[in-house]
Amino acid sequence: MLFAWAPFPALLGLADSCCFVVPRSEWKALPSECSKGLKKPVRYVVISHTAGSFCSSPDSCEQQARNVQLYQMKQLGWCDVAYNFLIGEDGHVYEGRGWTIKGDHTGPIWNPMSIGITFMGDYSHRVPAKRALRAALNLLKCGVSEGFLRSNYEVKGHRDVQSTLSPGDQLYEIIQSWDHYRE
């Protein structure tokens, strides 16, 4: 059922998109209560990890995305899952708030001017699956081609902009090698 959304990319603001994004409806997200938009194109991308459980199949990643959203909405009282996108080790990108809604991933200074991409899992002591890294890089490339990200966008690690261990030592080392990474 993962491909059932393919005829409806316009519903995600992804008409003629090069991105493979699992829509909220596919992972059975709760309705968002967020409405504050992001000014496009966005200059910054903040990479984090959830520091929670890993997922490696569409079913387990959909469940993990729901778990993250439930915690952030019900326990923390946020209007939705904090991130614009979530990356699973199944190699899929899961729509959080998407390209157009401000996230709650990095605090009041960075949220209004960045896209938050989180890798589901804890990457302190292990690297993400290659297919997860490819999915994230493809999402960034598509963000530029679709006009959501500036062509000269900058990638930051969560720890570069906030006092945290996120995105974990192993993932942080990897993103530092990405072309758009800036400390």
Swiss-Prot record:
Positions in coiled-coil regions: none
Residues of the signal peptide: 1-17
Alphabetized Pfam families for the sequence: Amidase_2
Annotated compartments: Secreted; Cytoplasmic granule
InterPro entries noted in UniProt: Amidase/PGRP_sf, Amidase_domain, Peptidoglycan_recognition, PGRP, PGRP_domain_met/bac
Tissue: Expressed in all regions of the brain.
GO cellular component labels: extracellular space
Cystines in this chain: 18-142, 34-79, 55-61
Highest taxon, organism lineage: Eukaryota
Induction summary: By sleep deprivation in the brain stem and in the hypothalamus.
GO terms assigned for molecular function: Hsp70 protein binding; molecular adaptor activity; N-acetylmuramoyl-L-alanine amidase activity; peptidoglycan binding; peptidoglycan immune receptor activity; receptor ligand activity; zinc ion binding
Keywords for this protein: Antibiotic, Antimicrobial, Disulfide bond, Immunity, Innate immunity, Secreted, Signal
Family, as annotated: Belongs to the N-acetylmuramoyl-L-alanine amidase 2 family.
Known role: Innate immunity protein that plays several important functions in antimicrobial and antitumor defense systems. Acts as a pattern receptor that binds to murein peptidoglycans (PGN) of Gram-positive bacteria and thus provides bactericidal activity. Forms an equimolar complex with heat shock protein HSPA1A and induces programmed cell death through apoptosis and necroptosis in tumor cell lines by activating the TNFR1 receptor on the target cell membrane. In addition, acts in complex with the Ca(2+)-binding protein S100A4 as a chemoattractant able to induce lymphocyte movement.
Protein name, UniProt field: Peptidoglycan recognition protein 1
Organism: Rattus norvegicus
Name of the encoding gene: Pglyrp1
